[in-house]
């Protein structure tokens, strides 16, 4: 059943060449990953209702099959604290090419990491860990491994990051939960193994 629902999402996504964020959130939720509270809408009244359920401040992101990098079109707005700003954001995002909705999510504090994957034709599923955010393509601070992974593999990936000191609490920043990060990497590798034939 789980695979059937995920397979349907991935089949739908082939037309764009990537999975839209709400669909990715759905896959992660189905697979037991903890995700931020979120909702998707095209209507102002519903956006306000969702934001109140989630609790301000919220993040708003464009959902569009025509937009791969949301930040390139100013399609991500963080720290929205009130209904008026939320509605203005919806109005602006709705004018961007291919607008299919606005994702509203809870603000999550902390360091941004990227965990990604590619199904290599020779090696099968490859898992990537790196420093996230808009600088991911500039800094190229990443580590790669073939799936499936064990926790020791995840630990080696973390140790290979140049900016790994940020993860352990650099200066006044809080350290991240390394155990949770390793488990997330391992579980993500299992997801990639399960989906490699889809």
Give, region by region, the residue ranges found by the protein language model.
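ATP-dependent carboxylate/acyl-activation modules
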Residues: 1-198
């Amino acid at each position: 059943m789980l695979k059937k629902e995920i397979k349907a999402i991935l089949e739908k996504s082939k037309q764009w060449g990537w999975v839209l964020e709400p669909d990715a959130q759905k896959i992660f939720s189905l697979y037991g990953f903890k995700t931020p509270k979120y909702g998707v809408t095209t209507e102002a009244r519903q956006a306000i209702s969702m934001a109140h359920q989630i609790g301000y401040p919220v993040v708003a992101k464009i959902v569009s099959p025509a937009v791969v990098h949301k930040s390139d079109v100013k399609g991500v707005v963080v720290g929205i604290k009130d209904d008026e700003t939320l509605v203005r954001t919806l109005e602006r995002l709705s004018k961007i090419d291919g607008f299919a909705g606005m994702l509203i999510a809870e603000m999550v504090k902390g360091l941004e990491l990227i965990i990604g994957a590619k199904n290599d034709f020779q090696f099968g599923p490859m898992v990537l860990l790196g420093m996230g955010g808009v600088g991911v393509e500039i800094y190229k601070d990443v580590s790669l491994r073939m799936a499936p992974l064990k926790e020791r593999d995840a630990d080696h990936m973390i140790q290979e990051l140049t900016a790994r000191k940020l993860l352990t609490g650099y200066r006044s920043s809080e350290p991240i939960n390394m155990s949770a990060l390793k488990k997330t990497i391992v579980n993500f590798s299992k997801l990639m193994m399960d989906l490699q034939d889809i």
